[in-house]
């Protein structure tokens, strides 16, 4: 039996319509957005390097055909995708991993295995409206669940097979210079040795300008036979801009915490086909554009690239386009692809 993810069709949880639909075009693009009707595993290598990846795939709740029945199958479902993300990610890449609490817990070891460093867990609190009329408190054996997780990870790059803090320490050691001279190089009292060249838990990521000073001093005064120092390619020392690109971005908006009080998606933003669904939503897991915009603007700059591997109705990609970013997304259910693409003004069918 293949371990590859199957087609992502809604089954068993009130699917509103049959997902069968014919498409004239299975790839749509406009210079800012590219949408593929395909398994994302088949197109990752064609996409530009991501600055952010927004994952909203299997939850382990039989949400679609190919989803697992419970959280036990989550690691196997995601592993091939996570491995592909890691091959294309850089130190500047942020992953936003949407899931249930138990789904995220099951996936976390796989994310760590492939180099994703946990940053923070954000909770979407949908409020009591999410369960209104759907909970019998006389029989339920737990508190009603009204939350969903959106967990932030940063890709942890390696240089010379070492993580960044050990690589910095190793490179200075190679120079043959006393570590105390690193403080002189940076114009600091002791922060270079205490923080930037510390391979332990006190390590801090050096600002780009500080890194450039370290590299310049090392290459000017260090053992000539070991040059270049602080080089990623073995030819030239890294520049300040190259070093800055070894860390993911984050811009925290004022007043926002890791608990997002936001009612369930409803109204005009919820995609429906009244003649087919009788008023039901097309996609059970459609995310609000405002939450997608929040995470994209926090972790990318205009013009940077966002991936949406499990597109659904392409909410992350639409938010990315509206925020002036580039988006690459895949969805292999033709109906979802068609309905999502129409949100951009494309006509795929």
Regions found by a protein language model. Name each.
Residues 340-341:
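Conserved SAM-binding loop
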Residues 1, 348-349:
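Short intrinsically disordered terminal tails
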Residues 336, 345-348:
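Conserved phosphoryl-transfer catalytic core
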Residues 1-13, 21-329, 333-337:
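Core catalytic lobe of class I
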